[in-house]
Every structure is written in C-alpha cells, then in structure tokens.
Amino acid sequence: MASPCDPLGCDEFFRGGFARRKASSYRSRGLDRTAARMLAFLRERGIAGASVLEIGGGVGEIQLELLRAGAARAVNLELSPAYEAEAAGLVREAGFEGRVTRRLQDIAVDGDGVEPADVVVLHRVVCCYPDYERLLAAAAEHARGLLVFSYPSHSVLARMVLGAENLSFRMRRLRFRVFAHPPDRMLSVLREHGLRPTVVHRGMAWQVAGAER
C-alpha cells in the first residue's frame, strides 16, 4: 500500500487537464525530445529484462517505451493523483497490464516498500522538488545499474524564466514552485552514492545526465 506523502503543491498544479494533455501529446507525437534522449541513453547500455523505477513519471510514457524496448516491469512513484486515470488508459492501450505498478509516494521522505531497480528515471522532476540532494540520494540508492534524469539549464536566462514562473505561482496562491538546482552539485550527489555520471545533453532549456554503477 502506498504511504501518505506531502504533494508539495504538485496536486494543485498537475491536475486532470494537464494529465489529459500529456497523454494526448504522447499518443499523437510520442516522446518529447528530452525524454527521447533519456531513452536513447538507456537503450544504448542495454535494458533487456530490466526492472524500471520512475520517480514522478506522470502518465508513464517513458516507462511504456522502456517496456517496448525490452524492460520487464516498471514501478512509478507519483506525488499527484491526477495522472492515474490517463496512465491506466495508456497501459491498457499498450497491453502492459500487470507489468506497471503505480504508487503515491515520496521516495525522498519514505522509501519503505520501494525495491531497488536496474534502471531509475527522473524526467523533469528535480526541478519540482526543493531538496534535490535528498531526492537524488534516494534515487541513486535505488539504482542497481543505471540512472538518468533531466533538469533545467542553470543559465542566467533559464533562472530568470523560472523566477518569473514562481512569481506567477505566488500571485495565484499556489504552493508549487520550480527550481534550477546547480548541475555540478546534483552530479556530485550521484557520485557520493556510487554512480559514475556523465552529461548526455546540454540544451538551452533542458539538460540530461545519465549515470552507471
């Protein structure tokens, strides 16, 4: 049974309409470019028969592509319940019932019952979480082989954009915030937990880092 968790405002921001748009976009266009780069990193290193843990996977599109590419099973941990109906629909359409488990749980606060996995994925998740060190440490501890995550650029322009977004959230009285955490420090957290990180892609908006044990 999933443990109770503080959604950190994610339940206010990521609601049913957002989930429906994400699922519709995936059905019509597939993975976004950043997610596709993450998938390529994992496929190049081999995922046949692998177990997958995705933290904050939303409607689960990356998990589905990993299963299509040969992964055995996937677990998704989420803070917002709004994704569940759309995610279940995508799983049914893909024919992967019984191979995907979804839970409402904050692994950084409570990792009880979360088994280590061969592959750990965090797509646009660390930017929504204030304590990146705790989150990435928990993710790394659960990665038996590979970990890949995406995060916003740390450029001045990117930080200004995120600052403007946070101002709008405050004006709308939303608890949700976004963060541009320092990339070097995030990679150091992975090293401290036995992973060898490498930057896979540096984009103007989004960057991707992968790591191996």
List the predicted regions and their residue ranges:
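Conserved class I S-adenosyl-L-methionine
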Residues: 1-45
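Conserved Class I S-adenosyl-L-methionine
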Residues: 162-178
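Class I SAM-dependent methyltransferase "Motif I" SAM/SAH-binding loop
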Residues: 56-58
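Class I SAM-dependent methyltransferase SAM/SAH-binding core
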Residues: 61, 65-99, 104
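A short, conserved alpha-helix within the catalytic core of class I
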Residues: 129-139
